[in-house]
């Protein structure tokens, strides 16, 4: 494409109308229908010439020689970056639905995320995916030491993902005594130890136990530092060792209504990716698509974010995974204390209502960020 080419207002108007027609109908459109349907206030011949120029520069194409034109992946990319705005109405609907239907009291984060994906799938009409925070991003909320049988102590760690980790620790007597008369650890002693751990570890990941200065313990508790440190270290290692990227997914029935997913082989490949190869999806949820901020067929769209919205959109062949190359994936990170801990996404055809999809994802990410903080 000629690097000197730049879109005029008419080019943008015709491209936008073509894309909106195709999103609504899944059918190619000709110049006459486009001029009449969208009141472009120019003749069909002018529209035809403009569509031809857009095709020349890779933004439209003809699926068949006798048919009208449809948008290419590059056309969608330009539309997403320059010509559309997220739907405020849909965003408000998502926020209201999540606020009204999710009950955060006494439920695990995974259960809440599962319910959230069902809401997002229903509103968007696409497949909804949410990543579960991994242990290296999950912070300690509370620690409690409780006496159990045999003079042992149960250490319970509550994470701010609402998950719990626990380990049994064999502590020696907390007060001087002979082995025969050694009492079980006193509740007051365990409370003091719990408070020490909470003071130093609340708001930090499990992995930070290695940096804890046990010398700050009162002298009488010093013998227990190494045992407690080892117990916490074992918890952290156990959590990280069992960890795999995890997605909560909902809405397969929704996306199957789209004509692009009537191909059994295509949908089987996507389902296989979601069920068996989730680790391959992980980078797409935490990276920027290659064409989001660079030259597009010679047309400089650098810096044209989605009008200030912190959302990434992977369109068609921008997706590195072959089963996804006929799809669009819209994703946004949710945060805890300004650190990204997970991501929300919707997956559908490239012929996606991007205004709605971006609004759904961004509103959901904002809601989760606020709830977790």
Positions of predicted regions on the chain:
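Residue-level marker of regulatory loop/turn positions in helix-turn-helix DNA-binding domains and
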Residues: 7, 27, 259
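Short, leucine-enriched amphipathic alpha-helices that occur as contiguous helical runs
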Residues: 7, 11-15
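N-terminal helix-turn-helix
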Residues: 17-20, 28-84
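Intrinsically disordered, acidic Ser/Thr/Pro-rich low-complexity regulatory segments
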Residues: 87-373
């Amino acid at each position: 494409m000629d690097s000197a080419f730049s879109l005029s207002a008419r080019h943008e108007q015709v491209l936008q109308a073509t894309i909106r027609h195709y999103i609504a109908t899944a059918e190619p459109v000709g110049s006459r229908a486009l001029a009449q349907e969208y009141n472009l206030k120019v003749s069909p011949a002018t529209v035809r010439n403009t569509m031809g120029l857009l095709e020349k520069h890779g933004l439209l194409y003809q699926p068949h020689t006798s048919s009208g034109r449809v948008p290419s992946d590059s056309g969608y990319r330009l539309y997403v970056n320059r010509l559309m705005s997220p739907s405020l109405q849909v965003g408000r609907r998502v926020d209201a639905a999540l606020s009204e239907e999710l009950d955060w009291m006494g439920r695990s984060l995974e259960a809440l995320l599962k319910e959230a994906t069902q809401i997002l799938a229903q509103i968007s009409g696409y497949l909804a995916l949410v990543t579960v925070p991994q242990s290296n991003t999950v912070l300690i909320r509370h620690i409690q030491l409780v006496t159990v049988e045999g003079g042992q102590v149960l250490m319970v760690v509550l994470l701010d993902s609402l998950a719990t980790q626990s380990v049994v620790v064999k502590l020696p007597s907390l007060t001087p005594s002979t082995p025969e008369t050694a009492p079980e650890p006193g509740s007051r002693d365990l409370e003091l130890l719990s408070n020490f751990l909470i003071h130093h570890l609340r708001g930090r990941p499990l992995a930070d136990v290695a940096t804890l200065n046990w010398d700050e313990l009162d002298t009488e508790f010093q013998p227990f530092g190494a045992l407690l440190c080892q117990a916490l270290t074992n918890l952290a290692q156990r959590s990280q060792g069992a960890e795999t990227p995890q997605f909560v997914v909902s809405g397969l029935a929704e996306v199957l209504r789209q004509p692009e997913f009537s191909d059994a082989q295509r949908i089987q490949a996507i389902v296989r990716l979601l069920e068996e190869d989730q680790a391959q999806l992980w980078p797409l949820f935490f990276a920027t698509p290659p064409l989001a901020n660079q030259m597009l067929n010679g047309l400089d769209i650098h810096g044209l974010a989605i009008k200030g919205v912190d959302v990434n959109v992977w369109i068609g062949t921008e997706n590195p995974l072959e089963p996804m190359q006929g799809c669009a994936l819209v994703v946004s990170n949710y945060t805890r204390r300004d650190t990204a801990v997970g991501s929300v996404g919707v997956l559908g055809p490239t012929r996606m209502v991007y205004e709605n999809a971006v609004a759904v994802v961004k509103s959901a990410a904002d809601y989760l960020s606020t709830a977790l903080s």
